[in-house]
């Protein structure tokens, strides 16, 4: 294979990957648990917002609130992973 052609393809892939990273950072997904806890996350999976309704807070049952928070985070993380899969689907790279 021609080295110049290979280098050009690598540069194009780097530009495309940079664009994808920017797009993922700008996108947002939301995960919820029983409507009591809501988590927003960007396309990279970084939590950007956490909302807890007052009725979710029970001093005698902190474990239930912890479970709701985890469920909301995991729900949002699944959606963020979906965005990542969609964004990288056209690259044809294994593991992306």
From Swiss-Prot:
GO cellular component terms listed in the entry, alphabetical order: bacterial nucleoid; cytosol
Annotated compartments: Cytoplasm, Nucleoid
Disulphide bridges, residue numbers: none
Keywords: Cytoplasm, DNA-binding
Main location: cytoplasm
Domain of life: Bacteria
Short name of one Pfam family: YbaB_DNA_bd
Gene3D superfamilies: Nucleoid-associated protein YbaB-like domain
Disruption phenotype: Mutants display an increased sensitivity to oxidative stress, and a slightly increased sensitivity to ionizing radiation and UV exposure.
Record flagged with keyword DNA-binding: yes
Any one Gene Ontology molecular-function term assigned to this protein's record: DNA binding
HAMAP family: DNA_YbaB_EbfC
NCBIfam families per record: DNA_YbaB_EbfC (TIGR00103)
Assembly information from the UniProt record: Homodimer.
PANTHER family recorded: NUCLEOID-ASSOCIATED PROTEIN YBAB
Role summary: Binds to DNA and alters its conformation. May be involved in regulation of gene expression, nucleoid organization and DNA protection.
Family note: Belongs to the YbaB/EbfC family.
Designated name of the protein: Nucleoid-associated protein DR_0199
């Amino acid at each position: 294979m021609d080295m110049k052609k290979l280098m050009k393809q690598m540069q194009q892939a780097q530009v495309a990957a940079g664009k994808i990273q920017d797009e993922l950072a700008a996108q947002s997904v939301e995960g919820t648990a029983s409507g009591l806890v809501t988590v927003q996350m960007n396309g990279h999976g970084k939590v950007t917002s956490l909302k807890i309704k007052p009725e979710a807070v029970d001093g005698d049952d902190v474990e239930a609130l912890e479970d709701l928070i985890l469920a909301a985070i995991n729900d949002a993380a699944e959606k963020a992973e979906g965005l990542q899969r969609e964004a990288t689907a056209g690259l044809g790279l294994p593991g992306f």
